[in-house]
From Swiss-Prot:
Gene3D superfamilies: Nucleoside Triphosphate Pyrophosphohydrolase (3.90.79.10). The lineage of its organism: Eukaryota, Viridiplantae, Streptophyta, Embryophyta, Tracheophyta. This is Isopentenyl-diphosphate Delta-isomerase II. The keyword Coiled coil does not apply. It comes from Clarkia xantiana. Catalyzes the 1,3-allylic rearrangement of the homoallylic substrate isopentenyl (IPP) to its highly electrophilic allylic isomer, dimethylallyl diphosphate (DMAPP).
Amino acid sequence: MSLTSRLYKPRLFSLPSQHSFRALPILSPPLRSSCIPAPLSVRASLSTRSIATSIAMGEAAADAGMDAVQRRLMFDDECILVDEVDCVVGHESKYNCHLWEKIESGNMLHRAFTVFLFNSKFELLLQQRSATKVTFPLVWTNTCCSHPLYRESELIDENNLGVRNAAQRKLLDELGIPAEDVPVDEFTPVSRMLYKAPSDGKWGEHELDYLLFIVRDVGIHPNPDEVADIKYVNREQLKELLRKADAGEEGLKLSPWFRLVVDNFLPKWWDHVEKGTLSEAVDMKTIHNL
């Protein structure tokens, strides 16, 4: 099959029963050890970086209304560019990686992660993204969704440690969850998926997403620059949230990556979380092309 990811098209969904999963198109990449991350020595020189940043800032002049915190992150953060079998091919600013024009015309596929954090009652922590987020503002999504950055600690391929380090960092940044509440060894990378989704006419996502699960009772202190609201939900409460989103009630919207996971994987994986058998669901050799 083609390795080209399909454009996410919003449509009505219903939460599948735990026994109604359909076969999914998948990519079967080589073993992760065969994908050697691009060394940090390929970074541009400081002078080249300065020129590139100046050009990018000039291109972004029309975005003067962008929130200052989000603007800084857009230009300071460097995403990890990958190919469709998750081999590192370079790095690019978060700004360029999320411009829909560049996504459609060039290789802006980048590595990402999405965290599903459950408490000891097996309730899932959701967040509503802040109104100032550049992509998908005010949508409800799973616990934390972001990117590992092009830095040594987040490029570590062995045991997916780089991605787990990034998840710990962003749980603190977005939700104020202390690192000691979410030890990196407690994250379970369950699988990976590749998807593309527009946010509006200008911004969008094209990600190779690591799906990370963790069961911990944590302290939460949301960062208002990142998060508008939070809630824990059980299965029935999630079904009601999906119903409202499908019906367009209360202006409620869900992120496309969260919806893809809900409709394709979450009920079965939630079963494993409750039974303490999540390791049986792990498949990190497959990339689901959704």
